[in-house]
Regions:
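Core beta-strand elements of the Rossmann-like FAD/NAD(P) dinucleotide-binding domain
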Residues: 12-15, 184-195, 378
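Glycine-rich active-site loop/strand segments that organize a redox cofactor
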Residues: 62-98
């Protein structure tokens, strides 16, 4: 047993609005709730200064700016969302949580000390991913996350760093609070709140990584579905959980950079030096991400690999800007490319398809807690924002939608006259469950357990899937249930990893079940059913909603979505 356990304390905490997850969406939610005059508590598994998907920085913000062209308007943007994220994006929600909040989000970014402009004072915009015009504002967001952390501290938000949330509790069907523990000291927290915003991102480490290391991923490896699982167990409805997302990355280095490359005009070519994306989408290298991945997979499957990012036609100034931008998300990516022999001039950079992850099928929606126009779930008092929700993704939605979630959570909290009770017996049971892996002298390590989950997911639905592969995955994943009670941990760090592994396991089952129920292919290859290879708008243009009922049964339904065309 870890030596710190003998000093473990139990803390009782009360607040108006609790924010679970201190990434971009969570911190913007906290700003809004504090601005509304609520007591705000931020709980983060890491440290809010550098945590979440943009912990290392970010270089793009999607926005329409109303500069004059027909594509640069609210209406054109929503039309674009409807085309590119058809069947996954609820335009009514987007209109409320993004469009209504966009101007304020842009102003807030500048106000906290991060300029969206280039050194010459101009806004530089690029076009990629199926956009009708250059919606990407290219900027230096290296210090955006620390600046947001400073802002929530300035607004007097209470912060609990290094606390992993373990479960959510209701009282008479409404939020009562949640539990968690300090991943360093083992202190246990019982937290009561009038409202909570869940902003803990998507689920990673579910599939085999491109380079073998499950922590060297395109996306944040600390996002392990912790609150997707906890919310699901509390009866919160989830949506868009069936999608398996991938991107194009440098061979040997999973890193962001897709839109930087294509926004600057780079193009994908096969080993015959042929640009191939024109064969898969009319916009060629400006196509939506899923088409780019689909095209790359087909070229590799048909023997025309490896694939390359062709930058030979870019001008010296464009290359200089590109390599600077690539270092904003991950400092070492430019160094890696140069060390591999890719000179800045005349570069032909070998690329590949990244590892899959359970996440949104488009930059224009999310995957997770089903939200309405108020960012509210089906459970009173529980709200969601960012990648943890079914309608938000990327910086633009995390900034705008995160703030919207905080506003609505605060408005709800102000109507609640008293905190709801946490059941004493349930608290004791949860504390015992959380620390039980530390008491086991022998058993399974988190690495062994998690690796088995990854193998099953990769083999059965990462990304090609059929009814047989999905039912087989569920059978194998269900057989792992008994092994959950055998996980052991030798210290607090391993305890955290054990709970992450357990959450990844549960989310993998949720994802497989949702994919099984969607008997069509959509956003190829993110939901590619080899037994149903066509998109079926007549029957499946909508959100696959999955929910655990009070009796423990898991149910699904399709919430149909309507679009102008």
């Amino acid at each position: 047993m870890d030596g710190a356990m003998s000093d473990r304390k139990v803390h009782e905490v009360e607040t108006d609005v609790a924010i679970i997850g201190g990434g971009t969406a969570g911190l913007n939610s906290a700003m809004a709730a504090a601005e509304a005059g609520c007591r705000v508590l931020i709980v983060d598994k890491a440290n809010i200064v550098h945590s979440g998907a943009i912990a290392g920085g970010i270089d793009h913000f999607v926005a329409y700016l109303g500069t004059g062209p027909s594509w640069d308007t609210r209406e054109a943007y929503l039309g674009y969302v409807g085309r590119v994220a058809r069947g996954a994006a609820d335009l009514d929600v987007h209109d409320a949580v993004y469009c209504d909040e966009l101007d304020a989000a842009l102003a807030r970014t500048e106000k906290i000390g991060v300029s969206l402009r280039q050194p010459d004072g101009k806004i530089f915009r690029t076009q990629a991913m199926g956009q009708p015009g250059p919606y990407f504002i290219n900027f230096d967001g290296k210090h955006l996350k620390p600046k947001m952390a400073m802002e929530v501290k300035r607004r007097k938000c209470e912060i609990l760093n290094r606390v992993q949330v373990t479960n959510i509790y209701l009282h008479d069907g409404e939020l009562a609070g949640f539990t968690g523990y300090d991943i360093r000291t083992g202190d246990f927290y019982r937290i009561r709140a009038k409202a909570v915003v869940i902003a803990t991102g998507n689920t990673n480490r579910m599939f085999n990584a491109q380079i073998g290391n499950p922590f060297n991923l395109w996306y944040c490896p600390a996002n392990t579905g912790d609150l997707h699982r906890a919310a699901f167990d509390a009866g919160v409805a989830l949506a868009n959980m069936e999608y398996v997302r991938m991107t194009i990355v440098p061979k040997g280095f999973s890193a962001p950079g897709f839109n930087a490359f294509f926004g600057m005009g780079a193009r994908l070519v096969n080993s015959l030096r042929e640009p191939f994306m024109k064969n898969y989408h009319e916009m060629a290298d400006k196509a939506p991400r899923n088409f780019m991945v689909w095209g790359a997979l087909q070229e590799l499957k048909e023997g025309r690999g490896p694939i390359y990012m062709d930058c030979r036609h870019l001008k010296p100034k464009e290359l200089e800007h590109l390599f600077f931008t690539l270092g904003i998300d991950k400092d070492t990516l430019p160094e890696f490319l140069l060390a591999k022999g890719y000179a800045k001039e005349g570069a032909m950079i070998e690329m590949t398809v990244s590892e899959p992850m359970q996440a949104r099928p488009s930059e224009l929606c999310g995957s997770g807690i089903r939200i309405d126009r108020n960012c509210a779930s089906n459970v009173p008092g529980i709200y969601a924002a960012g990648d943890a929700s079914d309608q938000m993704g990327c910086l633009h939605m995390a900034m705008a939608g995160g703030f919207a979630a905080g506003k609505h959570a605060a408005a709800y909290a102000k109507k609640i006259t008293h905190l709801r009770p946490l059941d004493t017996h349930a608290m004791a049971e949860e504390e015992a469950r959380v620390f039980r892996p530390l008491e086991r002298r022998s058993g399974i390590t988190y690495r062994e357990f998690e690796n088995i989950v990854r193998i099953i997911c990769t083999d059965h639905f990462g990304p090609v899937k059929t009814e047989l592969s999905l039912t087989g995955a569920l059978e194998k994943l269900n057989r792992l249930d008994t092994a959950r009670d055998e996980l052991k941990a030798d210290n607090m760090h391993e305890l955290m990893r054990a709970h992450e592994a357990l959450n990844i396991h549960q989310v993998s089952k949720i994802s497989a079940r949702a994919a099984l129920e969607r008997r069509e292919s959509r956003f190829h290859p993110y939901q590619y059913r080899a037994d149903f290879p066509q998109t079926d708008d007549a029957n499946y243009c909508g959100l696959m909603v999955i929910q655990k009922q009070p009796d423990g049964a898991v149910t699904t339904r399709l919430d149909k979505l309507k679009y102008a065309a």
